[in-house]
Amino acid sequence: DEILLASRLDAREADVGTVEDVDLIGLAAEECARVDADLDVSAVPEGLEVRGISKLLRRAIRNLLENARRYSTGEITVQVLRSGTLAEVRVCDRGPGVPLDQRERIFEPFYRLPGASERSGGVGLGLALVRSIAGRHNGSVHCEDHAGGGACFVLRLPLARAK
């Protein structure tokens, strides 16, 4: 499933869904409910919409949550906020974190952190797909330290234009 999606995203002209205004808070809430993650939208008093393909954005958030669940030893928190002209989804965990020198490599297809092969699940495509989906939406994704231990994956997407 992920390999097929990755190949379709590589062929950028491939039809992978309809572009529409997507309620990012609603999408994040649904995905957080699936894995019992805490969602914080306190920084966004009103809705937050991005222009994109709903099923791809859902997959990006789901992959970030599944990655956090796979490596975390504690709670997973998701924060959705506005940062200028961008929407930001921050998925933070209490896992071992990601060494600074690995923070770009983890987004390469099939790359896994040393020692990760012993953990259950995953083939090393999830984060590569997130980066590809972000790029298709003129956005970005990166990894940073989580205060108190762990990692935060930050997905940034352009906000939909006001109607």
PLM regions and their residue ranges:
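Conserved micro-motifs of the catalytic ATP-binding
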Residues: A11-G17, E49-G52
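Short beta-strand/loop element within the Bergerat-fold HATPase_c
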Residues: E75-T85
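Acidic ATP/Mg2+-coordinating residue in the GHKL
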Residues: D93
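Short conserved segment of the HATPase_c
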Residues: V98-F110
